């Protein structure tokens, strides 16, 4: 047993010694210009993604949750394309604001307070959020008709995928399970 440990110790010392250059001239000269350029590109991408994700947090936690619609331009382009969970797509920030406002008519306490998962790649980011609220006001359904509130709370997992250009989203994909949402607020069995 001692001999096996001794052999292992000697092997470890050999590996450590061989990893240390004998003299300064043996040190690697650095990365190739191509590799250094790629490293800088990746670092720049990571910085941009971190900035975009920080903007995303501000969007959901503050702008959306507090209905600060005059600030939506901080995260969305003027001509943003938004793809909604029910399959419809809207064009332009004003239409997007109109749709967002409609969510608060029947659930004024709608809130997103957490992004447990967030990441990005290139010009894209994605966050998973948890949207909560209470169906506490009448829900307009068109033609002057309303669904009366049930008082039921909702707590749904949602995901947003955003394409960023010049520091704002020019395209946004929203995902959540509408059937689960409707069940939670008491409109589906």
Briefly describe each language-model feature range.
Residues 15-23:
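C-terminal segment of classical bacterial N-terminal signal peptides
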Residues 1-9:
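Bacterial N-terminal signal peptides that target proteins for export
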Residues 23-189:
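C-terminal and inter-domain tail/linker signature
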Residues 8-11, 20:
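Serine/proline-rich low-complexity intrinsically disordered segments, especially terminal tails, linkers
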Residues 14-15, 189:
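Hydrophobic alpha-helical membrane context
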């Amino acid at each position: 047993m001692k001999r096996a440990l001794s052999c292992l110790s000697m092997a470890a010392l050999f590996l450590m010694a061989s990893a240390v250059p004998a003299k300064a001239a043996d040190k690697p000269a650095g990365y190739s210009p191509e590799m250094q350029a790629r490293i800088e590109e990746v670092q720049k991408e990571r910085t941009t993604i971190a900035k975009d994700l920080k903007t995303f947090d501000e969007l959901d936690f503050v702008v959306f949750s507090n209905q600060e619609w005059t600030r939506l331009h901080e995260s969305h382009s003027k001509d943003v394309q938004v793809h909604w969970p029910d399959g419809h797509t809207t064009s332009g920030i004003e239409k997007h604001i109109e749709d967002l406002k409609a969510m608060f008519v029947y659930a004024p306490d709608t809130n997103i307070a957490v992004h447990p998962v967030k990441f990005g790649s290139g010009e894209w980011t994605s966050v998973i959020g948890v949207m909560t609220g209470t169906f506490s006001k009448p829900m307009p359904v068109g033609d002057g008709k309303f669904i009366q509130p049930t008082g039921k709370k909702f707590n749904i997992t949602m995901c947003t995928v955003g394409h960023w250009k010049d520091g704002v989203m020019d395209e946004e994909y929203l995902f959540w399970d509408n059937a689960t949402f409707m069940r939670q607020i008491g409109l589906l069995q």
